């Protein structure tokens, strides 16, 4: 079943009783997601989330992917839905009392309208800069995303490093606009919306303070969330971008010795979680 941005998701989150005490926000690509195409999220992760219900834990995926792109891979093998999903670093979907995961309609519409204004005003300016980039650094391999004129897809993360360095003076001159970067992908967006602000919108629904959040991710869009909420438990897999690893090392965050999220989650539990 195809899923479109803005719809109620098919399926249900696990039943939840009592107050939400803890929130776990997980990046998807290169963090929660494994390389196993047949089982992109491990059974052991789902079983852990099931067992942590007793601690008042809700969990979700906070990604730069669109909802259709995420769900096309996640839903066929997921035994239950996340309690929340944040897509494109801004749109929010949250589990209701019946377990259905539904969009925060007013929030999402506001995000859409604000970002359409950015698209209208910034697209010609960005494309002029990208033309200069093509002329001055023709060896770099990249494209403008076919479905978003403010998104750039590079050959690899190192190429995106070079692109971001070239665009930095231009981006810093834009009022109310910020880059959202994940590895080899980057989009310009309204600076009011990012993974951190999306997670805050989720937490407000369940009244969970940021000191009771765990934020796990590997990219610059996750780093921005770490910087906005350093009081949260922040962690990254061993494969995270060097900028992310450096910030965590300097600020007492958790760096896994392996790819994935399980080691980080097992580190977080004894430090913070107790049964009510």
Report residues per predicted region.
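Mg2+-dependent phosphoryl-transfer enzymes with acidic/Ser/Thr/Gly-rich catalytic loops
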Residues: 19, 189, 196-276
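Non-catalytic pre-domain segments flanking phosphatase-related domains
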Residues: 1-28, 36, 44-51
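Active-site phosphate-binding/coordination module
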Residues: 41-140
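Conserved acidic, metal-coordinating active-site core of Asp-based
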Residues: 127-228
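Short, aromatic/basic amphipathic alpha-helical patches
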Residues: 74, 164-170, 242-252
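Short glycine-/acidic-enriched loop or helix-start segments at secondary-structure transitions
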Residues: 35-36, 70-72, 96-97, 225, ...
């Amino acid at each position: 079943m195809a899923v479109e941005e803005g719809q109620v998701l098919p399926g249900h989150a696990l039943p939840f009783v009592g107050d939400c005490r803890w929130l776990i926000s997980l990046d998807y690509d290169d963090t929660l997601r494994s390389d196993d195409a047949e089982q992109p999220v491990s059974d052991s992760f789902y079983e852990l989330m099931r067992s942590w219900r007793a601690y008042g834990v809700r969990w979700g995926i906070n990604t730069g992917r669109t909802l259709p792109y995420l769900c096309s891979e996640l839903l066929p093998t997921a035994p239950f839905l996340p309690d929340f999903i944040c897509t494109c670093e801004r749109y929010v979907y949250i589990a209701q009392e019946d377990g259905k995961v539904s969009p925060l309609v007013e929030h999402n519409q506001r995000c859409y309208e604000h970002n359409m204004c950015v698209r209208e005003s910034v697209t010609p300016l960005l494309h002029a800069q990208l033309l200069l980039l093509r002329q001055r650094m023709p060896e770099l391999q990249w494209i403008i995303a076919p479905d978003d004129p403010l998104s750039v897809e590079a050959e690899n993360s190192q190429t995106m490093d070079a692109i971001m360095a070239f665009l930095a003076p231009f981006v810093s001159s834009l009022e109310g606009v910020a880059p959202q970067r994940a590895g080899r992908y980057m989009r310009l967006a309204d600076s009011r919306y990012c993974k951190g602000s999306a997670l805050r919108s989720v937490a407000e629904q369940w009244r969970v303070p940021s000191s009771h959040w765990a934020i796990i991710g590997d990219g610059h869009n996750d780093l921005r969330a770490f910087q906005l909420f350093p009081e949260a438990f922040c962690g990254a897999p061993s494969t995270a971008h060097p900028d992310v690893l450096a910030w965590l090392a300097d600020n007492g965050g958790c760096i896994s010795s392996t790819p994935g999220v399980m080691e980080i989650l097992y580190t977080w539990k004894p430090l913070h979680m107790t049964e009510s």
